[in-house]
A protein has these predicted regions:
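Hydrophobic alpha-helical transmembrane segments of membrane proteins
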Residues: 2-136
Length: 136
């Protein structure tokens, strides 16, 4: 539920940024632009949270630190990987402004949503299996 609201808020901000807001600050940004690729990375990070943290927590239900630190490390690595492509020649299109390369952006967003849904369902099922084995 919280992930859904966060993703909805991010989607609204991305659409607002892609359609209405246009400034030199956004055009000369060295980091990732607010576009559908960035939104797909948010879906991926939430999927990783569900897999690494939630899945790891329900293995023991009392060791919260290890899955949290593991998720933070994985999240940082994914963020670095997501920020890198638009600095690599030939991959600049993932950092498109506005509706430039919209088909690529939508395909990347669709991939992020599918990965999020699959990983979340698998993580949920695994967490339920682990939770049944835990003696609380």
């Amino acid at each position: 539920m919280i992930e859904g609201f966060a993703l909805l808020l991010m989607a609204l901000c991305v659409v607002l940024r892609m359609t209405v807001l246009d400034s030199d600050v956004y055009r000369n940004n060295a980091m990732m632009n607010a576009n559908f690729f960035a939104l797909s990375m948010a879906f991926l990070i939430f999927a990783l949270f569900n897999m690494v943290f939630v899945g790891g927590f329900f293995k023991t239900a009392y060791k919260i630190g290890r899955p949290f630190v593991t998720f933070i490390i994985v999240c940082i690595l994914v963020t670095f990987a997501a920020e890198a492509p638009h600095h690599i020649p030939g991959l600049e299109r993932v950092n498109a402004l506005g509706t430039d390369d919209i088909l690529l952006q939508l395909l990347l967003l669709l991939a992020g949503i599918v990965i999020y849904l699959l990983v979340t369902v698998l993580s949920y099922k695994g967490s339920c299996r682990h939770f049944e084995k835990i003696d609380i």
